[in-house]
């Protein structure tokens, strides 16, 4: 339950650091939702800030990603089987195509706001916390390219 607030005047904080990571071109003259919705995306690899491949330690980020810009639905599918991973919900790209936010209503309910470091028709990449090959927490970059395989998964919700 919510009621109107009539206390002192509130202001937004300015505490967020600038989002400056970039691994490639970020298209800003087209809706990020529409860019993501143009194709099925294949998570191809995960690298650290020095470009070292850490995909093996971050397999949970490798999947097929489907986005619908009209309904704001997203769903992640298993790369080997094309079956749902049970991670689905709603997404939106905001802040001049610099942030992809999504809320999962699937098996694991969670929300994430991830910095996009590349977004165009050929690739999209985001950064988040992941693991190095020794299991330590590090910043990683998850790369995606348009899917070229035979699966045509449909949303399951």
Where are these regions (language model features)?
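Lipid interaction determinants
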Residues: 1-87, 97-157
């Amino acid at each position: 339950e919510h009621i109107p607030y009539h206390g002192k005047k509130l202001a937004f904080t300015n505490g967020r650091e600038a989002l400056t990571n970039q691994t490639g071109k970020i298209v800003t003259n087209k809706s990020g939702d529409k860019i993501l919705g143009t194709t099925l995306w294949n998570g191809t690899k995960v690298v650290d800030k020095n470009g070292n491949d850490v995909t093996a330690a971050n397999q949970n980020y490798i999947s097929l990603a489907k986005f619908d810009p009209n309904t704001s639905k997203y769903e992640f599918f298993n790369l080997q089987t094309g079956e749902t991973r049970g991670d689905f919900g709603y997404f939106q790209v905001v802040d001049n195509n610099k942030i992809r936010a999504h809320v999962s209503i699937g098996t694991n309910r969670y929300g994430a706001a991830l910095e996009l470091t590349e977004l165009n028709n050929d690739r999209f990449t985001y950064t988040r916390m992941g693991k190095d090959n020794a299991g330590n927490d590090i910043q990683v970059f998850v790369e995606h390219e348009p899917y070229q395989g035979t699966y045509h998964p449909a949303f399951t919700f």
